[in-house]
């Protein structure tokens, strides 16, 4: 059992055999080792299995689904939230709720609101309070927000509850709620009201594929002004820098290809899930309505100057993008020609 006994046992065997006392000592160690192994097996089998709950159905009614509650404190999210009212959470509710909390986790200081639809943000807002933050998030795309998930990072107030009460949402999740806000929500029986004091994203994300699975680290990238490189003649103003960094936090959580348009530290429009960056840009500008003077954030580089030329038509003031295209020179030249300031982040923000 123990390497420390090898020499003494070998010497004893060479000298004529083991004494009864030595055999007893070795037997005691051997049985003790076996007992320890059995105890380890017992403890492993006695551990509580992860909490498993069946859901009404999956992404679609014809699909079965379930949720497994993870071990705390490795991660904290919708499965650990307290549900105050409403129907049981659906598969899509869990996905959208987590997407909202992931994006919301980017904003630690200012009151913030994120509205998610189909696992991608359709509105993000900051404000002096959560009511103002919600209004700004809703104004990004009030049409898409209908039937979405609302997440805020501060206590839900009566003022905010009155605003939410006027629109159909699936979920409202907040760290806590005023008693008055819960009373207002109680009239909306189908609204799921969740409280979660802290959100902790898992360190790794895992996706199953045919024949195996994929795993990767979570995207903990935190873009700061010092990381930016400005290759254009025109530089971003302080306001454009802060607006661009805000837009980058949003584009990071938007399905690729993604374009976010912002101005004066407010998100104006979000376009995601497009297979063409040109189309993503076009949709973002159509939703922005008046994009003149705005800052554009792109989750990946522009492979051609066509998107820049489209932005010039809309009088875009500045761009923040990863850079790294073999045609970066042409893109920079187009920006200089159209007097657009541009900053490179040095890394992209794909999300699939």
Set out the residue ranges of the language-model regions:
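ATP-dependent carboxylate/acyl-activation modules
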Residues: 9, 33-352
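Internal, active-site/partner-interface "lid" segment
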Residues: 3-47
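Short acidic-hydrophobic, aromatic-tinged amphipathic segments that line or gate anion-handling sites
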Residues: 1-2, 194
């Amino acid at each position: 059992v123990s390497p420390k006994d090898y020499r003494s046992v070998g010497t004893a065997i060479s000298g004529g055999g083991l004494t009864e006392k030595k055999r007893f000592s070795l037997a005691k160690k051997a049985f003790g080792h076996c007992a320890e192994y059995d105890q380890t097996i017992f403890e492993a089998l006695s551990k509580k299995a992860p909490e498993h709950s069946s859901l009404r159905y999956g992404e679609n009614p014809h699909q079965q689904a379930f949720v497994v509650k993870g071990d705390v404190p490795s991660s904290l999210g919708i499965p650990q939230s307290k549900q105050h009212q409403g129907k049981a959470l659906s598969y899509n509710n869990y996905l959208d709720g987590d997407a909202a909390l992931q994006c919301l986790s980017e904003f630690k200081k200012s009151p913030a609101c994120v509205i998610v639809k189909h696992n991608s943000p359709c509105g993000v807002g900051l404000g002096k309070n959560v009511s103002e933050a919600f209004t700004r998030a809703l104004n990004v795309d009030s049409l898409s927000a209908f039937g979405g998930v609302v997440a805020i990072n501060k206590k839900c107030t009566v003022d905010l509850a009155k605003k939410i009460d006027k629109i159909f949402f699936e979920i409202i999740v907040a760290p806590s709620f005023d008693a008055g806000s819960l009373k207002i929500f109680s009239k909306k029986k189908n609204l799921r009201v969740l409280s979660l004091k802290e959100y902790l994203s898992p360190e790794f994300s895992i996706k199953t594929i045919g024949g195996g699975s994929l795993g990767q680290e979570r995207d903990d990238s935190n873009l700061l002004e010092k990381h930016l490189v400005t290759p254009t003649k025109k530089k971003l103003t302080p306001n454009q820098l802060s607006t661009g960094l805000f837009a980058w936090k949003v584009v990071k959580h938007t399905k690729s290809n993604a374009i976010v348009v912002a101005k004066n530290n407010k998100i104006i429009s979000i376009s995601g899930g497009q297979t063409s960056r040109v189309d993503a840009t076009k949709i973002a500008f159509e939703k922005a309505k008046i994009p003149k003077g705005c800052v554009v954030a792109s989750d990946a580089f522009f492979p051609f100057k066509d998107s820049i030329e489209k932005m010039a038509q809309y009088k875009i003031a500045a761009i923040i993008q990863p850079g790294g295209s073999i045609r970066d020179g042409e893109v920079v030249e187009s920006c200089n020609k159209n007097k657009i300031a541009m900053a490179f982040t040095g890394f992209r923000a794909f999300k699939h």
